[in-house]
């Protein structure tokens, strides 16, 4: 059988068994021989059948666990799997002249053929059947294997040429390699599998080598993309940029004290033994093992203190940016540019913020948080010094904020939502979402983990917190409702229990927490992005939210955030696949994983309409997934500006829920060329005509939208005039959504006219007549009004009657008519 083994087999044998032989020889020297008396060896049969006696050799064969049936099936399947990779690669020479593709195909050809020979030898050595990958049976079998191309896809590949071949080859081969990695994972899940050291090493090599090759292929696929964001050059402060229909006004670096001057990018450190092992391998003459960028990132160590920028809140001319390290307060100029006023150090992460009057509410979740805002952390399991929950600061003196309240919670505060208040009795109501570990009971009473049968658990709940404005020190949890419970049985885990949804679906997190709850108080509803489900809540009684509807999505890994449109008739949910720290916008990632899901609210039910994912392929060094954003209040349209971590900023129009389209973007290259560092935009929000983005690692960016084929100058101007219909006139809190309204001004009227012209719903002559009158309004208003112009504008009677118009067009006509009537009223003396 040795003749059938190739060089790779001997390498595996030499590396593995040279070490094992030494151990066996040493064991022989140390273990004394023991005399064992002969006794019968018996094997019972099935119930009712006789017991039979075995000889020693047969007994050993029965008990032999050096390899399993799962190992054998894995090797057989992998031979067929590898064979298809050979077929795909050998189509390259007649199909493309791209040297990078030809080199890749050549490497795959050689490596896969060698590994097929090794697997055949492994099976032959154990007298197992060796499949013929060219047989009809094998061709039929491969359709059920993970990552294998279908017959139709193979035919399409064979008929493709040049760039079409390159793109299809890379897409199919990435899926093929990823399938091999999943086959290894499935094998390792089987009891007793990969016990054979040779097979174990081979399986590990497949996982690592294929992951590295996937990263290389992703880079090649990005290089074929025509999107300007694909393949941007790296840099911490000098990365290459791509921008469409936006203007970057300013980039401000983090304030002093909010970054490590010796490590501003917050790079992790390698494990010391990794360096030692690599040096030893180099000395021994072995080739250094290359690992994937993602695997390298997982294996790095990070310091206790984190300086990541997080969320934002606005009030009047004030901007507050949160951080894992504290928060910063800025004054916003008339041009929309922030100027730093105060920096407050108070570690604990993740630092989500809200502003209500002179109070700043701040989320703390990490176990290192201290009640006194100390930097040294807390190292013991239970301590009264530890703080996890909601901090409350008095910022009436912006130059010297003071902590005036602190509400301890069992799982800390990952995010929070200002639901209502101040009420007539001076109370603010807040929903708290804790996603961290449950505290020790010795540290905080009634904090109970997931003990089977104990309904007191801190899981499967949110906290309702009451903050008295006059005395925030008396803030407290007034309830912790089990909002996921089954209404009939009362079982707390009443929603998604975790796991996948079937073949080719995501592993979705269990619904035992809400990450974000966005409230829409004017309609008494809230949207919960609750780990395993999207939920629509009734908050008519804000202290007792209850579910109206629940949805799930087989492509969502973790329901992360929710945003209503301005009318509260739609919800855009986001999926944080990979937790935000992983590259999940690669060229080969599914377009409905780590994406947005858009739902219409119809009769209090969430009805799915579409997915949207930022379309530019990203490198392996760019963490990217859907994250926080806000509505851009363009009247008559649903426009959303959103953070995608290192995927940049994407602005979408989802007025047509079925067909969301990207209308603007801004992006930078990765922080590092060859290392995955968590960075990019945490949050991107629109406030009074300007877009602000907290860059996790770099600082704070300020941008504006500019006119384009998608968005007119009048629409941009109208959005800047929008104001909250209820509550404070100038405010924005991330998870408290208030519908915006617009004044009756020429800019707003022109915005509606632009939309009707774009949709060819109004004739040009009528539009020109209205615009001519609107052009006179500003001057006449400055002069105290004009009754004649008022009557002329009032005579315009606009309606969609007689037109075959959709609901959106009818609404625009109605709003334009109402705006013109408002302008007319304002002109009267």
Which residues make up each language-model segment?
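N-terminal secretory signal peptides that target proteins for export/translocation
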Residues: 1-15
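Bacterial N-terminal signal peptides
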Residues: 19-32
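Hydrophobic, helix-prone linear segments
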Residues: 33-43, 51-53, 113, 120, ...
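All-alpha RGS (Regulator of G-protein Signaling) helical domain and cognate RGS-like helical scaffolds
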Residues: 36-226
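Short, solvent-exposed segments of well-ordered alpha helices
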Residues: 69-76, 164, 171, 303, ...
